[in-house]
């Protein structure tokens, strides 16, 4: 067998192993998110080169939201699809962003059933308001402390 053929087989094996390991790690992270555990998602060094603490909005609870507030200490964002944003009449923060990453921020919101919007309980109430299909635009106040992302 030629040296180049052996080298190609070794490289192919390594690539398959890397892909398998990556699939295994991604599956493990997805399982943790489904269980409501916080995970850190790191973006590319070519982008913001940062990590985001991610939890499932459907599994948000006192423990994992407290964890996020205590250790992440940044903006709390909630990804929302077009249907949610339309139903709740949540507008984009700006029509055309000049943010080089084009992060699709909307106007921040709080549930009207919150006190200041800052506490863990207030943030949980706002998250549940966003997720509740029966919620109406009048159930939210703007601006608030949670940032829906389109």
List PLM regions with ranges.
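Catalytic domains of riboflavin
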Residues: 2-150
């Amino acid at each position: 067998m030629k040296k180049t053929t052996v080298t190609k087989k070794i490289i192919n094996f390594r690539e398959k192993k890397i892909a398998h390991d990556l699939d295994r790690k991604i599956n493990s992270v997805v399982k943790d998110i489904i269980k409501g555990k916080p995970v850190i998602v790191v973006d590319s060094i070519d982008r913001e080169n940062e990590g985001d603490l991610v939890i499932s909005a459907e599994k948000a609870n006192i423990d994992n939201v407290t964890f996020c507030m205590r250790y992440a200490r940044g903006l709390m964002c909630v990804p929302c699809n077009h249907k949610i944003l339309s139903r709740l009449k949540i507008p984009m923060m700006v029509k055309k962003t000049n943010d080089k990453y084009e992060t699709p921020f909307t106007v921040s919101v709080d549930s009207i059933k919150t006190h200041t919007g800052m506490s863990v309980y207030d943030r949980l109430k706002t998250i549940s308001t966003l997720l509740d299909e029966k919620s109406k635009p009048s159930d939210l106040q703007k601006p608030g402390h949670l940032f829906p992302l389109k």
